[in-house]
Amino acid sequence: MRRNPHFSLLKPQYLFSEISKKLAQFRKENPEISVIDLSIGDTTQPLCRSITQAIKEFCVSQEKQETYRGYGPETGLEKLRTKIASEVYENRISPEEIFISDGAKPDIFRLFSFFGSEKTLGLQDPVYPAYRDIAHITGIRDIIPLACRKETGFIPELPNQQSLDILCLCYPNNPTGTVLTFQQLQALVNYANQHGTVLIFDAAYSAFVSDPSLPKSIFEIPEAKYCAIEINSFSKSLGFTGMRLAWNVIPKELTYDNNEPMINDWKRLFATTFNGASLLMQEAGYYGLDLFPTPPAISLYLTNAQKLKKSLETAGFSVHGGDHAPYLWVELPEGISDEEAFDFFLHQYHIAVTPGHGFGSCGQGFVRFSALTQPQNIALACDRLCTASLKETMVLA
């Protein structure tokens, strides 16, 4: 059998796997050094008691014949979809438009497969690498990188001459940590509606938005129901990175060019390829929604980000993001190349970060810091960053 040619388009190693490998090698060679890993955006705070209690109760219920449950509905438990519609969307979205899934990555894969390979896809640059890799794996015909530069507030530069079938956006953004205003989001929705573009909006970090003057969901823009699909997840908001529970929204008003609703085909795809998310996790998510709009861990991570940002700026770095997201997008000091970025922070500060060029060509000249760690790690990182100014560190380097 011939190899699927799409896999030849992928880099030999996934970005974060490569970082883990380099970090493991450094620790092996330097066992006496304590490295603070601020590279990978995994959660660290334990689950809230209300969630673990719901998990325990559901597990016990499965021991009894009268309460045992087999398959659930492919689109998710009605009570969970209803609660998401109410708590997250303030009933702007109906439960029938919400589909419970096992994660944002699988949703991206399903969506790209759903639309088919003969499409033109616009991706932010820098972008979370999974988008680009999944686009390659699913055989998307044309992938157009859309530059997101600091001069434009890390908002994508949209093409005027070339039409996009699909436009993927992530806000609060990974990796830049930036957010959109209502006016900025309205302009992107207007573009999508004017050009017949389907806008896939990744709102996985929406729980980090605490300012009511900023949008959390694309559906806070009324016209978005004609052009947008939203992805969201419990991974960062409730600490479900290892438990896997997410959802996506397909509005009834979203149609093909023949005016047929897309939601009908999406239901068919879900029923064919997915038996539904774990009932155990759905029960956990249902009770976890009681912690919204700002689950306790979110406040802790945002405090981490604020402390880290202050220390980085005090040390002399230029920092973006971190106010409504767990990520800080830090400009590399002059004289440090992209190839040296990881080693610079690892050797000078004993801090592991993610090199920006791994997110795309427009990530060159930056690194990403993650605040999704324990407060004591942030305190130690801040101490190391402030021990010497950036100018002094550059002399040492």
UniProtKB/Swiss-Prot annotation:
NCBIfam families: DAPAT_plant. Keywords: Aminotransferase, Pyridoxal phosphate, Transferase. Involved in the synthesis of meso-diaminopimelate (m-DAP or DL-DAP), required for both lysine and peptidoglycan biosynthesis. Catalyzes the direct conversion of tetrahydrodipicolinate to LL-diaminopimelate. Substrate binds at residues 14, 41, 105, 128, 174, 275, 368. It comes from the Bacteria. This is LL-diaminopimelate aminotransferase. Pyridoxal 5'-phosphate binds at residues 71, 104-105, 128, 174, 205, 233-235, 244, 275. The modification N6-(pyridoxal phosphate)lysine is found at residue 236. It is an enzyme of class 2 (transferase). HAMAP family: DapL_aminotrans_1. Gene3D superfamilies: Aspartate Aminotransferase, domain 1, Type I PLP-dependent aspartate aminotransferase-like (Major domain). InterPro entries: Aminotransferase_I/II_large, DapL/ALD1, NHTrfase_class1_PyrdxlP-BS, PyrdxlP-dep_Trfase, PyrdxlP-dep_Trfase_major, PyrdxlP-dep_Trfase_small. Its EC number is 2.6.1.83. It holds the Pfam family Aminotran_1_2. Its cofactor is pyridoxal 5'-phosphate. Belongs to the class-I pyridoxal-phosphate-dependent aminotransferase family. LL-diaminopimelate aminotransferase subfamily. Homodimer. It catalyses: (2S,6S)-2,6-diaminopimelate + 2-oxoglutarate = (S)-2,3,4,5-tetrahydrodipicolinate + L-glutamate + H2O + H(+). One of its GO terms (biological process) is lysine biosynthetic process via diaminopimelate, diaminopimelate-aminotransferase pathway. The lineage of its organism: Bacteria, Pseudomonadati, Chlamydiota, Chlamydiia, Chlamydiales. Pathway: Amino-acid biosynthesis; L-lysine biosynthesis via DAP pathway; LL-2,6-diaminopimelate from (S)-tetrahydrodipicolinate (aminotransferase route): step 1/1. Disulfide bonds: none annotated. GO terms for molecular function: L,L-diaminopimelate aminotransferase activity; pyridoxal phosphate binding.
